[in-house]
Regions:
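Signature aromatic-anchored transmembrane alpha helix within multi-pass, membrane-resident enzymes
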Residues: 1-15
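C-terminal luminal/periplasmic domains and tails of membrane-associated envelope-modifying transferases
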Residues: 10, 16, 20, 27-269
C-alpha cells in the first residue's frame, strides 16, 4: 500500500498541475501580443528555421495583425557548421533588431552536440550571455508551467543543453516551491508550454566584432585568414581569397569580396 501511494500520489499531483497549463493563454500568443504592442511594423525579427515564427496572426485591439508586418529572416542552426555559415549568421545578426527563439527545439539539440555544432554552441552561449550585443526582453507572465497551488514544476532545457539560463530568477522560480526535474522530452514542452525568448539588439555590434568570439573555433588558419577583414571599416570580406578551415571536417572554404552572403551560394569546397 505504501509503495502504491508513493507512486500514485506524485503522479496525481503532477497530472493536476499539468492541467493548469491549459488554463492560461499559450506563451506564443502572449509573446505575439507583446510584439504587436511594442515593436513597430517593418522591424527585423530573425527567427530559427525548424521552429515557429512569431508573432502569430491574431486580433489586437480590434485589428487583425499579421506576421508579414515584420521582416523575418530565418537562421538555420542545422546547416553544418562552417566559416561560411558563421559569416552569413553574423551579417544577419548585425542587421537584425531582434532575435526570436520560440522554444528549446534548436538549442536543445545543437548545443548538446558540440562535436558537430561547435559554432552553434558558442553562439547560444554568447547570445544568452549578452556578448553578441543582444539583451533578453523581460516579459512578465509570458510562460505557463505545471503548477498546483504553491508548487510548480519547471523543466530546465538550458542546463540539459549545457547552457546557462538567460532568464531572470522570477521566471526560473515562478512559485514558492519550485521543482526542477531536469530535461523533459521536447514533445512535452515545445507544444504545450514552451519558454520563448526574445532578444533585442541593443549594442549594434558589427559582424567583425562578433566574429572575434568565434575565432578560436575556426582552426589554426584563422589567425592568418580571418572570416572578416577587420581592417576594412566597411566590413567587406577580405579581398584575397584564402582557405579558412572548419574544425570538424578540416575542409577549406574560400571567400572573396564578391561572394554572396547566403551560405547556400557562397560555400565552396
Amino acid at each position: 500500500g505504501g509503495l502504491v501511494a508513493l507512486v500514485v500520489l506524485p503522479t496525481l499531483l503532477y497530472a493536476l498541475a499539468f492541467l493548469n497549463v491549459y488554463r492560461g493563454e499559450h506563451p506564443w500568443l502572449r509573446l505575439s501580443r507583446w510584439i504587436y504592442a511594442h515593436v513597430p511594423p517593418g522591424t527585423t525579427i530573425a527567427y530559427e528555421a525548424w521552429d515557429h515564427r512569431l508573432p502569430l496572426t491574431l486580433q489586437q485591439a480590434g485589428v487583425l495583425r499579421w506576421p508579414d508586418e515584420f521582416h523575418q529572416p530565418a537562421l538555420d542552426p542545422y546547416v553544418p557548421d562552417s566559416a561560411a555559415k558563421l559569416r552569413a549568421w553574423l551579417e544577419q545578426l548585425a542587421a537584425s533588431d531582434y532575435v526570436l527563439i520560440a522554444s528549446n527545439r534548436l538549442y536543445g539539440s545543437t548545443a548538446r552536440w558540440p562535436a558537430r555544432y561547435p559554432l552553434m554552441r558558442r553562439y547560444y552561449e554568447c547570445l544568452f550571455g549578452g556578448a553578441l550585443g543582444y539583451r533578453l526582453v523581460t516579459l512578465p507572465d509570458v510562460e505557463r508551467q505545471p503548477r498546483l497551488g504553491p508548487l510548480a514544476w519547471v523543466a530546465d532545457p538550458f542546463g540539459a543543453a549545457g547552457l546557462a539560463s538567460p532568464l531572470p530568477p522570477e521566471r526560473e522560480r515562478p512559485a514558492p516551491l519550485t521543482l526542477h526535474p531536469g530535461r523533459a522530452d521536447e514533445s512535452l514542452t515545445v507544444y504545450d508550454h514552451p519558454r520563448p525568448l526574445l532578444f533585442q539588439n541593443v549594442a549594434r555590434l558589427s559582424p567583425q566584432e562578433m566574429a572575434r568570439l568565434f575565432n578560436d573555433l575556426l582552426g589554426e588558419e584563422i589567425g592568418k585568414n580571418p572570416v572578416f577583414d577587420c581592417q576594412n571599416d566597411r566590413g567587406a570580406i577580405a579581398h584575397n581569397p584564402a582557405p579558412v578551415y572548419n574544425t570538424i571536417s578540416r575542409r577549406p572554404f574560400v571567400f572573396s569580396s564578391g561572394d554572396h552572403l547566403d551560405w547556400r551560394k557562397d560555400r565552396k569546397i
